[in-house]
Amino acid sequence: GVLHPITQGEWEVTDFVGLRGDKVYYISTESSPLKRDLYRVGLDGKHKERLTPGDGYYSIYPSADLSYYICEGGDSSAPGRTDVFNAAGKRVRTLYDNAPLKEALAEAGLPVREFFTFTTERGDELNGYMLKPLDFDPAKRYPVLLTQYSGPGSQQVAEGWGPDWEDALVTHGYIVVCVDPRGTGYRGEEFKKLTYGNLGRLEVEDQISTARYMA
């Protein structure tokens, strides 16, 4: 027989969660390369549904028969939550909603990642995020620190929540910017393999383009 894809589109399936009856459960970047959502679709490719509760970055831990699964995650604006869902995507129990931590962070104040996309002088679209001081004044100029990793297939610009040293630096009056250059992951095979056999050149070019964009 001839094999046919169940799904298709300009996005990646990042994980196969399981098969229950005639439904396939999988995680993909369909809404954005920055996000991970759980989807369910028939083996015939029809009746596709997104099951995760909202746009964000989620991890899924299914039971053996996929009658239930644990959904953990959220977006970059606040700590995520952990819930149990049934196979139909209905929340049946909240294990942890991080409410105490959310209240404490609301009082303390933390910068929120601002995501952006820009086009380099070579015509490549790159995704990035920016952290600004809480008292940011658009009329002022600030020192900018570019942070990056850029390893093949990696990703630093994503919707998941998780404060790091960058948040501390922002409190001292810096803007922190991170951009995933050519060769990083979750934007398709062609984009990821642009640096194959040529590590170090394109990544540096894209960081220079980022600095020019921020100037």
Predicted regions, residues:
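Multi-bladed beta-propeller domains
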Residues: G1-D15, R20, S31, V41-Y58, ...
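Hydrophobic beta-strand positions that form the internal "hydrophobic ladder"
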Residues: V24-Y25, Y69
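Short, conserved, GDST-rich strand-edge loop motifs in beta-rich repeat architectures
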Residues: S28-E30, S154
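Short, solvent-exposed loop/turn segments at conserved positions within beta-propeller repeat blades
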Residues: E30-K35, D75-A78
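Residue-level detector of Asp-centered blade-edge/turn motifs that repeat once per structural unit
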Residues: L19-G21, A64-D65
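Serine-hydrolase catalytic core recognition
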Residues: S59-A215
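C-terminal structured "cap/appendage" subdomains that terminate the fold
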Residues: L34-R36, G42, L66-Y68
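Repetitive beta-architecture junctions, highlighting loop-to-beta-strand starts
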Residues: R36-L38, K46, G80-T82
